[in-house]
């Protein structure tokens, strides 16, 4: 018998877990490093378990309570069939485990289980339309081939433009100076770093762009304008596809939402963790890969 419901929201940078009892009382929360399935199933599995374990400890529950937990996993890249099935073959100690995408978890939370649409712009980006009982993914195919308007994309563009500033192709920029100082003003160091960098590594530079833009840096301001244009393109396309209510989520999305107000965005009712818990508890919801 399931006594506890666990929601997990996992993206490229962080994995968060929340536990509630059958009455809906919040018992505990935990977090770990990112659990984007495309970056490695074993790695994501370990981070998911670590986040849930931290939440269990926060709740003061014994380890054997795991056998009475129903878990809803809302993880980045779960929309990819091979990642989805591989994750569900991993061993879990829980009574039940259900898996969906981080986008659908966020959508369920944003609209409290009702239909709607969301555009997440965090480390990565993904749009999802939940309409007439069906799910439609918009973008979100992974960095760098997709994920426009994301923190990873913004970080990549900042590095690209900073290298041009360093070479004298573009005018001087305080953002470019800070970035190049980080790499010891050595272009070869940038190339070596990029050979092994993951989306979260690029995304760590996104706050630097916001900081520089607030100080009036022209390059940073142009990069934020570019990011807004990318998100605007996605929002416009989703509207054309039938999305009449869209919540803009994620660290990048929420910071840029005031500049995209003409799309009549709606505020989320709940967060992605509540959406993941709702997914765990509800049978009649779309499955990514039946």
Regions found by a protein language model. Give the residues of each.
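Short beta-strand-loop/turn "lid" adjacent to the catalytic site in phosphate-handling enzymes
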Residues: 36-37, 53-99, 111
């Amino acid at each position: 018998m399931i006594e506890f419901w666990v929601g997990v929201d996992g993206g490229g940078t962080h994995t968060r877990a929340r536990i509630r009892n059958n009455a809906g009382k919040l018992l505990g929360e935990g977090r770990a490093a990112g659990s984007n399935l495309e970056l490695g199933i074993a790695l994501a599995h370990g981070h998911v378990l670590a986040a849930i374990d931290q939440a269990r400890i926060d709740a003061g529950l014994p380890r054997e309570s795991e056998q009475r937990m129903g878990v809803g996993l809302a993880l980045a890249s779960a929309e990819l069939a091979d990642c989805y099935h591989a994750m569900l073959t991993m061993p879990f100690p829980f009574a039940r485990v259900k898996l969906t995408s981080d986008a659908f978890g966020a959508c369920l939370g944003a609209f409290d289980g009702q239909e709607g649409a969301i555009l997440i712009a965090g480390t990565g980006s993904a749009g999802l339309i939940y309409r007439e009982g069906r799910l439609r993914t918009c973008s979100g195919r992974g960095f760098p081939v997709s994920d426009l308007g994301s923190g990873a994309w913004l970080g990549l563009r900042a590095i690209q433009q900073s290298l041009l500033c360093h070479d004298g192709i573009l005018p001087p920029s305080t953002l470019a100076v800070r970035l190049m100082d980080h790499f010891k003003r050595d272009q070869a160091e940038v190339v070596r770093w990029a050979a092994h960098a993951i989306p979260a590594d690029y995304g760590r530079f996104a706050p630097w762009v916001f900081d520089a833009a607030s100080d009036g840096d022209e390059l940073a301001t142009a990069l934020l304008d570019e990011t807004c244009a990318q998100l605007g393109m996605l929002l416009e396309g989703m509207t054309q596809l039938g999305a009449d209510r869209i919540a803009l989520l994620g660290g990048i999305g929420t910071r840029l939402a005031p500049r995209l107000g003409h799309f009549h965005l709606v505020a989320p009712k709940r967060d992605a963790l509540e959406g993941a818990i709702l997914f765990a508890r509800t049978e009649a919801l779309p499955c990514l890969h039946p």
